[in-house]
Amino acid sequence: MIFDTDTQLPIAHEEAPDILHDLLLLRKMEMEYPGVLQDIQERDINAARDRLREYRNIVLSPVSSDEARDRAIESGKSLMGALEDVVFIRVKKIIQIACDSHESGHVDPGAILPRETELLDAINAAIEGYLTREGFTPTKEGMRLSMSSVATVTT
């Protein structure tokens, strides 16, 4: 059963969005037009996870036919591949946002999902710690190498 993440009500399978098609399309568009995945909604990722749980239930159910299991396995593999690609593309974008913000000051991250904020904060802290150890100091324009600290940095 798939649930609408906004209303928490069940959605009939035939009425559920084709999340695999949506993710594959997003992935293709991202390759052609970088930045498209900035617009992905958390409900899209949640819908993909809900659909994967549904496929898993079909595969594990003792009453499922072999044909239904085979279809669920194939669909699940495709959906997992698309979801993996989407998540890793998002991680790369978050890393790029963090690097840009340290290089040039504040950068508007665009549409960051709530679950991605923690990752962005952790990456920002790690980058700042590393740059500080390398002799950089924070300025309004981002982290800049300090001449006074260059002499004290050991390699």
Segments the model singles out, each with a brief description of its role:
Residues A151-T155:
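Terminal membrane-proximal soluble interaction domains of membrane-associated proteins
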Residues I2-V150:
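Charge/polar-rich, low-complexity and marginally structured segments
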